[in-house]
């Protein structure tokens, strides 16, 4: 199974947060599972750090490199098909551009999105894994 980690799931997984549920943690740790993250999430983390809303265990650039290695993550490129899909998603879906891009990428590339975001979990047009279960 291929998983696209939502921004908060990436943070929780690397920082060892107990918010990440047992079922999700097990699913992501299966050796054959592919774990992907988007540069959109890096942008969101950078915004949170810049606003002082979160503190990371090291500077952001180092954090990204360390987490990619430790969690065996791959980057999913932001492609034209996903960008188009972000604004042609089956409705209803909310207007957050980052969520739209993540959901679109998951749909276009056949990924399951690991998230605790209730708006994404309740959206019936993308495969998801509840991050807090």
Please annotate each region the language model reported.
Residues 1-38, 51-66, 109, 118-119, ...:
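Short, well-structured N-terminal submotif of metal-dependent ribonuclease cores
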Residues 6-7, 45, 86, 106:
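Generic structural signal for small/hydrophobic residues in well-ordered secondary structure
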Residues 9, 47, 99-103:
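Hydrophobic side chains within alpha-helical segments
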Residues 46, 66, 85-86, 123-125:
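Short secondary-structure boundary/hinge segments and terminal tails
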Residues 48-50, 88-89:
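Short acidic, glycine/proline-rich loop/turn micro-motifs
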Residues 55-61, 69-118:
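Active-site neighborhoods of divalent-metal-dependent phosphate/nucleic-acid chemistry enzymes
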Residues 128-130:
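Basic, glycine-rich
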């Amino acid at each position: 199974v291929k998983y696209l980690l939502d921004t908060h799931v990436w943070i929780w997984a690397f920082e060892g947060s107990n918010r990440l549920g047992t079922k999700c943690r097990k699913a992501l740790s299966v050796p054959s599972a592919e774990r992907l993250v988007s540069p959109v999430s890096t942008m969101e983390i950078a915004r949170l750090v810049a606003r002082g809303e979160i503190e990371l265990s090291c500077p952001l650039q180092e954090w990204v490199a360390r987490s990619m290695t430790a969690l065996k993550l791959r980057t999913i490129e932001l492609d034209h098909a996903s960008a188009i899909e972000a604004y042609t998603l089956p409705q209803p879906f909310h207007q957050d551009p980052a969520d739209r891009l993540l959901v679109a990428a998951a749909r276009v590339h056949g990924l399951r999105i690991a998230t605790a975001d209730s708006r994404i979990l309740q959206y019936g047009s993308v495969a998801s894994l509840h991050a807090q279960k």
